[in-house]
């Protein structure tokens, strides 16, 4: 959740542990509260525990489209 505090300061919840994080240069890992939470999130993406939803991924299975990708 994002909340606005005084003087245009925003606070967001860390996506991993839900701790409040001030959205400013003093929080270098934002939106995460720490390097640890940032790495946990990265690990979840790398392990394919998280993904961007897609209705149809036929383009990945189409050999004609795959040829184009292989040339690069």
UniProtKB/Swiss-Prot annotation:
Binding-site positions, Zn(2+): 14, 17, 33, 37
Gene: yacG
One BP term from GO: regulation of DNA-templated transcription
UniProt subunit comment: Interacts with GyrB.
InterPro entries: DNA_gyrase_inhibitor_YacG, Znf_NHR/GATA
Function: Inhibits all the catalytic activities of DNA gyrase by preventing its interaction with DNA. Acts by binding directly to the C-terminal domain of GyrB, which probably disrupts DNA binding by the gyrase.
Family to which the UniProt record says this protein belongs: Belongs to the DNA gyrase inhibitor YacG family.
Known cofactor(s): Zn(2+)
Protein name: DNA gyrase inhibitor YacG
Cofactor stoichiometry and binding remark: Binds 1 zinc ion.
Listed SUPFAM superfamilies: Glucocorticoid receptor-like (DNA-binding domain)
Species of the source: Mannheimia succiniciproducens (strain KCTC 0769BP / MBEL55E)
Keyword set, alphabetical order: Metal-binding, Zinc
Domain of life assignment: Bacteria
Gene3D superfamilies associated with the record: Erythroid Transcription Factor GATA-1, subunit A (3.30.50.10)
GO terms of molecular function: DNA topoisomerase type II (double strand cut, ATP-hydrolyzing) inhibitor activity; zinc ion binding
NCBIfam families: PRK00418.1
